[in-house]
Amino acid sequence: MLIQERKKKEVIMEIRIQAIHFDASDQLQAFIQKKVTKLEQYFDGIIKAEVTLKVVKPETSNNKQAGIRLLVRNGDCFAEKIDNTFEGAVDGCTDALEKQLVKFKEKIRSK
């Protein structure tokens, strides 16, 4: 599934959601879209976001895995988390990516 969001400067960030071996609900896709677009407030140069969702081991409680890869100008960032819900895993990923984007932005500014 491909979702595109328009930014203030008319630059489009592409959000690609891939659910492996299941169909993601519209509610889950809307949640992911909302969380990923919030990452733009930490760094302007996000070009593309690739979100991968999969069930790791059905017999355990923490079996929902989410991975988010952000393509940004001059590099990329990646986070992967496992939780008992996809929402929790996506939350963990976006929290980790916020920190990465802040560090990346500071690194660029210091050059």
Where are these regions (language model features)?
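N-terminal, polar/charged subdomain of small-to-medium soluble alpha/beta proteins
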Residues: 2-111
